[in-house]
Amino acid sequence: MDDEIPPFSLVGRHVQDYIQQVAGESKVDPTLIENILPCTPWQARLLTTATEQHEGTLRAVLELGEDVGWSRFYAAWSKVVQAASILRTRIIKHDKYGVFQVIMKEDAAWKFSEATAKESDNQPVEGSFGQPLSTYAIVTDGDSRKFLWTMDRAMFDPHMIRRLTTMLSEAYHERAFAGLKGFDCFLKNLQDRDEAKYKAFWTMNLEGSNAFSFPTSPGPPEPTIVSRYESPWSLLPLVSPKLDSSNLVHASLAVVLGRYFGEGDIVFGALSSQRDTSLPDADMIMGPAMTEFPIRIQVVQDQPVASLLEAVALESLTRRPFEHTDVSEISNLNEDTQRGSTYQTLMLLHEAENCFQDDRSIGTWIDETAMMFGAHPLVLQCFLVDGRVKVVANYDQNVLRSREAEALAEALILVMRQIIEAEPSKKVKEIDCLTPSELERVWTWNAALPAPIESCVHTLIEQQSSRQPTALAVCAWDGNLTYGELESLSNRLAHYLARLDVGQGTVVPLLFEKSMWVQVAILAVLKVGCAFVLLDPSGTAGRRKHQLERVGGRIVLTSERYSDLALGAHHFAVAVGSHSASSWNALPVQGLTCPSPSSIAYVIFTSGSTGEPKGISVPHRSVSSSSKYHGIRAGVSPSSRVLQFASYTFDASVFEIITTLVFGGCVCVPSDQERLGDISRLITSMDVNVAFLVPSVSRVLEPSEVPSLKTLIIGGEPSTRTDLQRWAHLPTLINGYGPTECTVFSNMHNVDLSIWNHSTIGKAVGSSSWVVSQVDHTKLAQIGAIGELLIEGPILSHGYLRDPEKTSASFIQDPPWLLQGGCGYPGRRGKLYKTGDLVRYNDDGTLCFVRRKDEQVKIRGQRMELGEVEHYVRECVQGVVQAASEILLPAWENAKPVLAAFVTTIKSLNEEAKNLATYRISAMGLGIEESRKLAENLPEYMVPTVYFTISRMPITASGKIDRKKLRDLGAEFLTQQAIEQKNTKGLIQERSMGVTEQQIQQAWSRVLNIDSAFIGLDDNFFRLGGDSISTMSLVAELRKLKIHISIDDIFNQPTLRDLAGSVTAIAPHDEGRTGGSKKDEMSPQAFALSPMQELFFRLQTDPNICFDQCYLLGLEQRVSFEDVDRAFQTIIGRHAVLRTRFNRGMDGKWEQRIATSVSESYVFNSVTVSGDRECAQMISQARGKLNIMSGPLFAALLIEGTEEQRLFICIHHAVMDMVSWRILLRELEQLLLDGQLTVPPGMSFQEWCSLQDKHISESFAPVQAADDEKPKVPRGWELAPDVDGILRIESFVVDQRVSSKIMGMSNDALQTKPIELMLAALTSSFNLAFPDFQHPRIFVESHGREAWDNNIDVSRTVGWFTTLFPIQVYPGSSLLETISQTKDYLRGLPRRGWSYFASKFVTEQEKAAFVSKFPVDVTFNYVGMFQQLERTDSLFKTLSLPENCRPVSLPQSKRLGLFELEVSLEDGCIKVALLYPESANTKKEVELWMGNFKEAFAEIAHTLASV
């Protein structure tokens, strides 16, 4: 039967090595070796990882019948042994070849014993490496005889055992065996498989696996204590023939485990002996075809059960050909498969009661295989036989309690029944997993609901005042109050409020620092029938404004310190303090009419996911009930001195103040300074004996330094075992839990470290605690399963203030399980709060906190919605596409939780498109403005501590952000960063920046619109995208910070490190040189033109010709006409040059003067248009209104369209340049968003022109203008008279990859700047396209703001500063030579061409000679990138002008060059646009030129990369 596969052929060429190893280890004759075979991966894993010799050994007992003859039975079994070579197999372990199996030519080894069956069963197994692994014994015990068969677990599977016991029957009755197949057939099939396909399948199957392991080990590994639970057989409903048994079991287990995990990505192990159906007669293979592999099932709770079964069936069908890849092989493929292979639960399916084939004529088999399945913490065996089901659970008691194992087995059967009977529309979340026995226990814990305390809060406190009027009620830094004094003062203030018409039911805000007067104010508000809301006076104005608007009312009680705090037009402050008390000191001391216990006592605001805080309204009944119940549990009494440490916006302050007063204790109130100082000294000095602290605060205290403290309640955020061990000596140590919606505490747990789990929050206080399914609150969760905590009882708040929608979503009424009751407990009606916290029941009914269901978390005791944090990160941080925030816990000792923000940006997403295999994460810095905006919108504790850019957001299988992956990535990054900083001194130095360096880094970030995290000390400003125009913006930014840096400094020291070294502070006497005086601005006298203006007026003699610059801007948020108009008035009043009037003097020369009227210097209208044609017409008319002689020089339109609002601005070019546009738009945006400008104006253009004119006349000696001969124009270049008429446009875009090199790394080789590479590309490509044109006149435009005195600052000045200079570079023999020449020429120009241009305007003769050169052949203008319009948070976005919006006169404007090139940087790509006269007969050459120009960029990027 084994002839098809030659012996020894499966172990390769080294057969003799194998044989020698066998002979030496087994001490057998080599001739007795029948065959040597490799082991299956499953066998190899078991044989090399077994921890005990007996583990998994088959121990089968056959009770022989009285009539069975021994010799006949012996012969029959011997025949079986000879036919089934697996029974003659030994295992050899070779140092080089690993484990392999050897088939021996030998008979069965028998033993005979007179021991009892029990004694024999406990005998050690003899099998080991090199020894027989299948042994047999006849045991006699009195008159009974038993056949005992032991076999190593790696040598059998259930199918093979059934086949072998069938063969015993056939041999005993002398029937021929059916055609058997040797195990080598199966092994040969495994060897021949396509490994790549197997690896590819499992890699894909487990990609992104992030499943939690169940059951979860509670701590370090301990010796396994295996227990067994076996459910009774029970009937199942009739199963459809279409429903495969394995799919039913696997789907059911996935549902059950999904409820335990609280996750939809479920992975568990399966052990199968599935024969490969591609092999003929696979059922006859005699060998262990066992394999263990992971099964991954996505459980979507909202999907129909039928869909789940279809998905499981499809997964099973797809997986089946690849199941014989053992879990050990799968685990080693990658990280995902490794995670997917670390499951703790193993499932086996049996479709027979046991794996033996009984033959009553021989005897009865007793199954002894319970220990055969390995060391998983939970092994489930499901038996499906003849419509009946039984589940056997083998579990480790160190990991899983007996009740949990039993409940899980019963739940599996319960779910199977529901799946079988499910209607087509039934959803997975509707499946009930709670068994009747568990339901009874849950009701036992929650049957008795505490009675409400029907009393107002202040009534309970008044009772204490009556009992002990002289006892201290408040001991504060600013004074003490007895209960009698507190009662008297609060009553008088209540009467005062009543006289101010503060009506009952009003919510009265309180704005106080820590003070004894807070207690007075609280009680006064309650006594007048109102509710109080404590606000944080140090919080942001925006948040306070929202809260005041939310609660309504007019009166705000403040401390005398905050009585002048801005509250808005609809609120006014009433000060409460020692001085203001005289206003109400004479009022009655008797109380007022008590409101109903159902009326609101206080409102408290918590974080909201939409960016707006939620106000929670809490009635008197809830406060009284909660205070009474949790006060008793905490042991609060008249002798209690309770520290009032919590912020007033944290509901723990309610416990500290109200609960203390309700029980007659003393509220100990430190000052805000003391509270943030030495807390230990504070507690001791105030003799505090009761305190509530969040774990992070408790860690700063030394227990030995607070001997007065007797009771400590820790809560607000999860604590660690270490946190509590430090305080274990206290008489009372409590772990407290409670959502704000449930009035401070809903659960408390007296800590017992000997039995305590650090996440235990105890049992309910004043309430009942229910745990429901995470996705369906109409289903109770199993005991031990992760579910959402619901709280029922008198401590619940009313809900959210004036927000019924949110209230109904979080507070539910009468869930079906509450109405139904259960197991003898009657149902009831009730209101419950859905906490959003995931918990699970411990076995004793206490609760264990797991995590938040949504993104709401706590840090430093304060609750927040991560969604709110993410909302404002997106709003305030520029460039953010996606944002996610998480709490990180780095892996170093004593690490504190860190609030982190993860963002993707356009840049990171573009980079990620090239690499989808990994997540790249890096630290990110915020700009000063971004930090300011976050601080304005979020409380301090909600502002992230660390920011990361991530290449792409990790996604779970269900398509949601994988927050666990984010936490892992962030914590790993922080941990690794800490290690690097600790171990690498050089890195620490690299990362450490001084204050000046950090300021410059932030300025670079704002100007270049890139994250500061990407800017290092040795980064080059120009490599990061800087250009001559952005240097002006940088100078202006640094001036705001009182940092003096000139443009020359930036060009000469372009790295951050070097630039910081050149910094000098702005001297006080130099401030005047950076901003013009009012006198200069308003001077009506005419002043000189700038050189560029002079060139323009000499070329353009007709003043009526339109020569403007304009922008059409999209508005990201709507603005009013009035707001824009006010902004324009401010800007035109601020920049006098925009009020310029030009006129021609008697001598024919043009001059300029400043008009005083702002309103007559601009025209602004609002128009509504229906389409582009109408829009173009309106724009054309606006442009036509510009008049350089009478004004205005500024025109604008607010364009209202059907879908968006647009703003058009045009300004005459004679007073405007590209740097000026940046200044103007930045100021316009600030005015529209903030309503004011925070930076003073720069030097006036008038003063600049005067100073420049003086400097030119003094510094440049008149020279005879060179009568330059114009170059000979090639044939075909002769131009018609309308050279300044209709234009053609040619353009191209350089791809981002090449552009990024031109702007960055390509400059490293020759230390060039991007503009130098651009001009080299221009000159070389022009020469190729026009070989007959020798030495074209190419002029470069520059921003011209080159001050000869470093104290002159025109970085914030609007005007026309442009300069022109020629570039005289003749293409060399190579591209590198051309680049080198270009660089040398440009670097040799004094002041980047300004000196050349200025020198041409010294004398009339010089001016005339220079003007005669125009139009030149080519002008080149690099305008750079408009960073402020590319920010994602910019108010403006640039739009294209509609066609046909040019004024009629525009084609008549004079041009500076025949070919005008403009180069810009948009969205990371270099864009080149060429304008030239339509009359030029050069279209073919121009197209060739543009093609060469574009190729030159690519060639430069490639060439310089290899230098």
From Swiss-Prot:
Region described as Condensation 1: 34-438
Residue stretches making up the Carrier domain: 991-1067
Record Gene3D superfamilies: 3.30.300.30, 3.40.50.980, ACP-like, Chloramphenicol acetyltransferase-like domain, Luciferase, Domain 3, Nonribosomal peptide synthetase, condensation domain
InterPro entries to which the protein is assigned, alphabetical: AA_adenyl_dom (IPR010071), ACP-like_sf (IPR036736), AMP-bd_C_sf (IPR045851), AMP-binding_CS (IPR020845), AMP-dep_synth/lig_dom (IPR000873), CAT-like_dom_sf (IPR023213), Condensatn (IPR001242), PKS_PP-bd (IPR020806)
Region span, Condensation 2: 1087-1503
UniProt pathway: Mycotoxin biosynthesis
In-chain residues carrying the UniProt-annotated modification O-(pantetheine 4'-phosphoryl)serine: S1028
UniProt keyword terms in alphabetical order: Ligase, Phosphopantetheine, Phosphoprotein, Repeat
Domain of life: Eukaryota
SUPFAM superfamilies in alphabetical order: Acetyl-CoA synthetase-like (SSF56801), ACP-like (SSF47336), CoA-dependent acyltransferases (SSF52777)
One of the record's GO molecular function terms: phosphopantetheine binding
Matching CDD domains: A_NRPS_SidN3_like
Enzyme class: ligase
Transmembrane keyword on record: no
EC number: 6.3.2.-
A Pfam family the protein falls into: PP-binding
Residue ranges, annotated region (Adenylation 1): 462-860
Domain comment, as recorded: NRP synthetases are composed of discrete domains (adenylation (A), thiolation (T) or peptidyl carrier protein (PCP) and condensation (C) domains) which when grouped together are referred to as a single module. Each module is responsible for the recognition (via the A domain) and incorporation of a single amino acid into the growing peptide product. Thus, an NRP synthetase is generally composed of one or more modules and can terminate in a thioesterase domain (TE) that releases the newly synthesized peptide from the enzyme.
NCBIfam families: AA-adenyl-dom
Sequence similarity: Belongs to the NRP synthetase family.
Note: Gene clusters encoding host-selective toxins (HSTs) are localized on conditionally dispensable chromosomes (CDCs), also called supernumerary chromosomes, where they are present in multiple copies. The CDCs are not essential for saprophytic growth but controls host-selective pathogenicity. Although conventional disruption of ACTT2 could not be accomplished due to the high number of the copies identified in the genome, the high sequence identity among these copies of ACTT2 is likely an advantage for RNA silencing, because it allows knockdown of all copies of this gene simultaneously.
Function field: Nonribosomal peptide synthetase; part of the gene clusters that mediate the biosynthesis of the host-selective toxins (HSTs) ACT-toxins responsible for brown spot of tangerine disease by the tangerine pathotype which affects tangerines and mandarins. ACT-toxins consist of three moieties, 9,10-epoxy-8-hydroxy-9-methyl-decatrienoic acid (EDA), valine and a polyketide. ACT-toxin I is toxic to both citrus and pear; toxin II the 5''-deoxy derivative of ACT-toxin I, is highly toxic to pear and slightly toxic to citrus.
Protein name: Nonribosomal peptide synthetase ACTTS4
Organismal lineage: Eukaryota, Fungi, Dikarya, Ascomycota, Pezizomycotina
